């Protein structure tokens, strides 16, 4: 980054229409993968006033109650009444999921699992930075924390007039590549019609904004825009149509790093749009955690049906302790970025995905989870367990 600059990122809450769609798509994936680890799933969702539509391609031996899954996700988010604009119990659910094309399947499946080809061509990026403790850019980290706190305050009854839909935006000021302040904060939250703007602003400022953002980064010059239109009663799928995969920058690095264009939600790990992006984050985070660089962006690319990446490249933006070419060599030695190897390395064949579909796929904390008889670790791509290997190999 320049010596003196501003950078802005945004996030949206779990009740935002596009995020409802993402969560439904990943809930469908989780339900199928819980019964059939090797299923092929590509699930897209559309939500609009009174209806949810799921579509896509699935190859599986599992049977799951797709309609109930859709309703449960909508209800759990908090859309339980026409008063809030959407009701999981009464909305229409349309299922138009079909089977995966055999043309794609023949390019992916192999006699030897490790030779599994990529499910599609494409390019994916991973990124990490030492500007926060989770090795993520500060603007997107703060933006996620704001809408996550909005959901907590709503669900706990702390601010009972809140409704599910919300958006946040944070502008950070950088000097010498380091965050030195927050210039602007935007938080728009859906609410019931009974709360006054004065009460809403005070509640949001005191119990959400100030609760989340570091006081040392706020100043008398920080701009706060709380529901800047003055009213946000109509929200959710009534206000806007929601679609899977429309918040790919929110899902990743808030615009701080490049994006290959492929969405994550609703896709099983054979789709490198998802699994290779997770692997890219894993590699970049371990490079930064190892102290090889302060910032790192890695790109990988694939051809459909081909196991080995067609390219691996990275940029440490002048912060590397060794050359970028040497780091690429270490990446090739230490990380196997073939699709099946990624799935094995990150232990991705578990129902872990719905949790990723709100508040970002990166910068999260790995945790042990049990679903039925299956116990596994979530957010495995956030581990830094290869940092020491990189450090030793680099001679640091």
Curated annotation (Swiss-Prot):
One of its GO terms (molecular function) is magnesium ion binding. It holds the Pfam family S-AdoMet_synt_M. Residues 100-110 are annotated as: Flexible loop. Keywords: ATP-binding, Cytoplasm, Magnesium, Metal-binding, Nucleotide-binding, One-carbon metabolism, Potassium, Transferase. Its cofactor is Mg(2+); K(+). Its EC number is 2.5.1.6. Mg(2+) binds at residue 18. It is an enzyme of class 2 (transferase). It is found in: Cytoplasm. Binds 2 divalent ions per subunit. It comes from the Bacteria. One of its GO terms (cellular component) is cytoplasm. Belongs to the AdoMet synthase family. Catalyzes the formation of S-adenosylmethionine (AdoMet) from methionine and ATP. The overall synthetic reaction is composed of two sequential steps, AdoMet formation and the subsequent tripolyphosphate hydrolysis which occurs prior to release of AdoMet from the enzyme. This is S-adenosylmethionine synthase. It comes from Pseudomonas fluorescens (strain SBW25).
